[in-house]
């Protein structure tokens, strides 16, 4: 349609045409399914509408709802903006709110329906006996508010913005216009819907069909939501109330079969036969009365909240659920705007599968209403259908209500990026709403893992640009570094004299030697340039010689002392050799140092040197350093002297040495710094230098800091403009005391202090600053301005490519390293030339890219994981790198792995920042990323799905008829023997004791409660099912569930206490928990002697070896039903299986089960076929036994051949 004269268009409509009203072929939809769109309809003959002055009526009546809407005209389907007022049961509209004349529409016999399935333009139709009014709202929330207002008028109920939609509790249908691909009949007049494509209305919840003229006469019998909505159909017995079937007549699929007589039911000629809205059972009209009256709720019964469970309301007006009816209910949040408005289709489909009261639209009220409804449940699951932003929204609301211990959250990817859904195993996109039952089934079988969540803390303050922080007189920096030299020498001498620990003495002596040696080299290098003042140069050389002598004397005294002391073997840690090559002039000093280090750890019987002698040597060495500094200051005071280059510190910590080196750094820092506010930390009074900010500090071999090889990837160092030198110990010592830029201390004096910070948001996936954030910001702005251009994932990826290409030319943040400063775990990280920094929590970035460049650990970094409380920091060099990383796993840009990240933004202008795809411009100041909490996430467990599917195939009925949905336990389980009951009781008591000890310890150790809450709740719930006063109530099903949950609790507790990163408890609690854990282990070992529990609790063949405590913690709360017992008993039972010749009929029947031919067990047992006869069966024998299928004969004969070679193990 041209629509040239249209002045206003609804969102998502181009040229005035209705996006959701375009013509669609009947073949566009599958058989029996509703199509996505409806054809445009012209308004029929209209009744003459009275147009008079309505100002009087406007003043006398109260307005229920009013506002601007777009109205479709009859000419060329153009849209025009009109002002609408709903007063009483009449809808008024005019050009604006101040008009005197309004058109009026009588709503006495009106119905309201959405325009189409996807409804991208948020349009709806008001249908009266005389006209149809097509209206369009600004967004979906506004549309639903208008629809609810109109429905409340029809039902004669006062409209108010309630907690839930009125139609959910009133039984009113939720109409939308659609077309059908097969003959469909109206459930009101029972006649066929007219037209080739069967135009009509369909209820989005119960699929009730009606003509548009009949919709107003439809009874309010939509899908039940609460106990009150069931009414007189409720079933009451001695056990309480039960859920009845809710039948809907007619319009059954072609393949429908009666659940009673197993014959075809339904018709394409008339409205006949019935279908239950809950369990999807279909029956003939004649068979309906003989069918079981209680509804089993069907395939999704685990996830459904039955209407009989919502039987009361609390003081706030929210429905209260009865927990006994809900095992693990599912709360569904759908973002109706996600995936090109695909969310609308999923919203309707979930209401058809579940209770409509447990399905919520995030765009209409947010997640609070749903979480408030489920707040009282001890354990429930959440499914978020949308993108990463929707998941973050729900998790933030869970934080406010403090529900992390009660709920596990799964993700159905409908958005653009969907990085979190990829990591959790749910894929990158999902479009097929017909597969939702299978998705719910996989969600029931999902395992649980913990997702680290991080707070983005900001502190805004004005910081001068780095370039303005360069010092005017370079000599001031020299004096500052010389003071640091002197203080460092004094600190390490104090440690050598006072410390009784050999590790501290070794570390301090080694650092002291290198400090003095490097200090002398720097001074000599400076005096070599001082050719004019030879007298001063000779004085400096003399003082340096004296200093070397004093250091030699101290080393000799320490050597003598080490020879005299007795140290137990092995207590001295090995000191790794330095990679640097010692100069020829320092050979004697290096030998003395090595001799000292080697001798301190050796036992000897010589007489100890007096501590006073060591003290004297140390004081003389300190005085010598002071004299050299004084002479050096004289050199710098000479006007003709060229100042020497300032010492550039290094961050090359040797992580192989003892932790005493870190302690030295912290102690020396604490002696110089006090707790400061972020403002004071960011503007320290020391002179500032910048290794990249200007020509005075160009990146050269002498002043470029060495990057920590344990933190920085060698590839990033190769990306730096020059080779890195200065790797002596002096650089390590300097970085423990000063910051090369002088802007912040190298180690934050109070790293955990967040005074003055405010939480900007919470990060679940990743954080970015610079290039990638600017691209995200521009994309978000474009999507807000032109949403119709960003309605599909393909278009969004194309836009990202266009914006990235533009940045390739503009290079807006090519000097980002000059505007920001990075610290990881309080350690300053010198940055190369880059355009952005990314901080990763999950191994998926910007739509599925593994930006870290791998998933496995190597010699430097551990494997990335989202449950280890560790972040990965990478550099973003340009947009080409971001594009290439989608194809090639790049690793040269890795920076660090750390637990906290601090980024300081300098200058007057803000820098783009993005968190999980949401971008903004962050003003200058400080950004800290710290751990907030952990959320329980549902991850798809494909291995468990495969195993369970194989098990379910073996549990098919003997008749060979496949079940609709095989549950974990199909047949009534037999009772337990007396010995088995007693063993289960002992195991339950041991598990209860372990739970008690865990709860006691959790009162002090919050982490214990956070890690084990899910396992403890599941185990307690299973134990409560077994009533100790009635042993006969303990069935095999209940016992199996108890054993699985107790084993899961045992695995989780053991992994937490003795796993890769053990949790250290206080001594009384640790002993009690360990004792209870040991008791549970003993009881579980006894349970493995029960044959039907052996295969559940036995060790797996491919079980992983014991965890290495030195490796990274990758544990999760996934159900580990395989214990860590030794395998001797399993091997013994395997080898003790009897030969095939001695098999009885029971073993033969079990062997048929292994072949998935259990339907022939009765035949073999009736003919008394034992092992000896089985081995001699031939094809004609099987035919005589009554096996008709050739394929089954071949499988049995092939199985007999396998028996002769490898007899199976049948326990």
Swiss-Prot record:
Residues 52-61, 670-691 have a biased composition (Polar residues). It is an enzyme of class 2 (transferase). A zinc finger (Phorbol-ester/DAG-type) spans 172-222, 244-295. Residues 1-66, 562-613, 634-694 are annotated as: Disordered. Residues 576-589, 653-662 have a biased composition (Acidic residues). Widely expressed. Detected in the granulosa cells of the primary and secondary follicles. Expressed in mature follicles and corpus lutea. Expressed in the oviductal epithelium. In the uterus, strongly expressed in the luminal epithelium. Detected in the uterine glands. Residues 1143-1206 form the SAM domain. Residues 325-460 form the DAGKc domain. One of its GO terms (molecular function) is protein homodimerization activity. GO terms for cellular component: actin cytoskeleton; cytoplasm; endosome; plasma membrane. Interacts with RAF1 and BRAF. Diacylglycerol kinase that converts diacylglycerol/DAG into phosphatidic acid/phosphatidate/PA and regulates the respective levels of these two bioactive lipids. Thereby, acts as a central switch between the signaling pathways activated by these second messengers with different cellular targets and opposite effects in numerous biological processes. Plays a key role in promoting cell growth. Activates the Ras/B-Raf/C-Raf/MEK/ERK signaling pathway induced by EGF. Regulates the recruitment of RAF1 and BRAF from cytoplasm to membranes and their heterodimerization. The SAM domain mediates homooligomerization. Belongs to the eukaryotic diacylglycerol kinase family. This is Diacylglycerol kinase eta. The lineage of its organism: Eukaryota, Metazoa, Chordata, Craniata, Vertebrata.
